Amino acid sequence: DLEEGLLDSSKLPRIIIDPYNSLSFKKEKDLEFKDTVVTLLIDNSGSMRGRPITIAALCADILSRTLERCSVKVEILGFTTKNWKGGKSREKWNKLGKLKNPGRLNDLRHIIYKSADTHWRQSKKNLGLMLKEGLLKENIDGEAITWAFNRLKKRKEERKILMVISDGAPVDDSTLSVNSGDFLEKHLKQTVKSIENK
């Protein structure tokens, strides 16, 4: 208990209980700030159309500007599929005789709106591409998280943070029509668990 310094908020309840107790202070100390990079991975699926994708783009813009002022590098990524209801992946599966349990049957589209080494001012217009008509299709979250994580782990920064902005579970009609109904969700959970254990 010091007489001056930074207010010790952990001791405030005792002042509320007994207002005659004196305020408690603690000594300020400068901590070394770890070199940090943040990756924002944004769901660019059709269910995000309208207000949700607008809010996600605004959040990415605000977070990027704010964190860069604190010397934190920010990467902004997006994920969707190239097609509705399959694409070359599904065509290939059809040509090969429609094998059982084929796995993913859509082509991925992973987008780099802003790389970590690019300043916000140079890439702010890219965020508007999220609002482009026809971009938002389906979402295969597990593979997108793996992609973002692999990009992040190549970075030299000491502290690495991956944030995902999404409105729900992964959905790809082409994949789910021939695999189990929870195929993509199970893969997502396995992916997250695997990354958390590294």
Please annotate each region the language model reported.
Residues 1-198:
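Acidic, glycine-rich A-domain
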